């Protein structure tokens, strides 16, 4: 609990943990669960604990954002890695039609966006069982050009 006391951004999470809130219960009008709060604050240790206690990694809030979206918006590669390793759906779209990858690009976190692009490509290859890695390089280059701050019209439809 000492870590929570050092970070003023997680007062809500601290309260939830102290009161014994369910890991999947939406605690506020925005329908953000404790896992949303942990991912959105970049708190990988609390995210891991919640995932181990059965948190729903794909639960969406009123904006249609899952914890993966929250982690992408704050640039937490550690939280993204935990969520992906726990089989979070990387292709979920929020109400604006944006994936976590799209949000990472638009929020200025290219390392997170490239990570999600690579994971998506690996999942596509695994699903199709065609190990042509050149397709991944082409997709990554395309996303880099679309991911610039200047180009906001290149939104992908889901």
Curated annotation (Swiss-Prot):
ANK repeats: 1-25, 30-59, 63-92
Cellular location(s): Nucleus; Cytoplasm
GO cellular component terms given for this protein: cytoplasm; cytosol; male germ cell nucleus; mitochondrion; nucleoplasm
Keywords, sorted A to Z: ANK repeat, Cytoplasm, Nucleus, Repeat, Ubl conjugation
Post-translational modification: Ubiquitinated by the CRL2(FEM1B) complex, leading to its degradation.
Motif Nuclear localization signal boundaries: 129-149
InterPro entries, sorted: Ank_Repeat/CDKN_Inhibitor, Ankyrin_rpt, Ankyrin_rpt-contain_sf
Tissue: Mainly expressed in testis, small intestine, colon, blood leukocytes and in pancreatic adenocarcinoma cells.
Major localisation: nucleus
Protein name per Swiss-Prot or TrEMBL: Ankyrin repeat domain-containing protein 37
Lineage: Eukaryota, Metazoa, Chordata, Craniata, Vertebrata
Gene this chain is encoded by: ANKRD37
């Amino acid at each position: 609990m000492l870590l929570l006391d050092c970070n003023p951004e997680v007062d809500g999470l601290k309260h939830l943990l102290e009161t014994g809130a369910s890991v999947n219960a939406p605690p506020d009008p925005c329908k953000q669960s404790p896992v949303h709060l942990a991912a959105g604050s970049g708190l990988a240790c609390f995210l891991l604990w919640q995932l181990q206690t059965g948190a729903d990694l794909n639960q969406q809030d009123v904006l249609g954002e899952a914890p993966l979206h929250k982690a992408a918006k704050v640039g937490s590669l550690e939280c993204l890695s935990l969520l992906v390793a726990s089989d979070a759906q990387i292709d979920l779209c929020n109400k604006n039609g944006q994936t976590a990858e799209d949000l990472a690009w638009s929020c200025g976190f290219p390392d997170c966006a490239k990570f999600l692009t690579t994971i998506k490509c690996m999942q596509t290859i695994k699903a199709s069982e065609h190990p042509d890695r050149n397709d991944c390089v082409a997709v990554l280059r395309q996303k880099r050009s679309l991911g610039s701050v200047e180009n906001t019209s290149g939104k992908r439809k889901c």
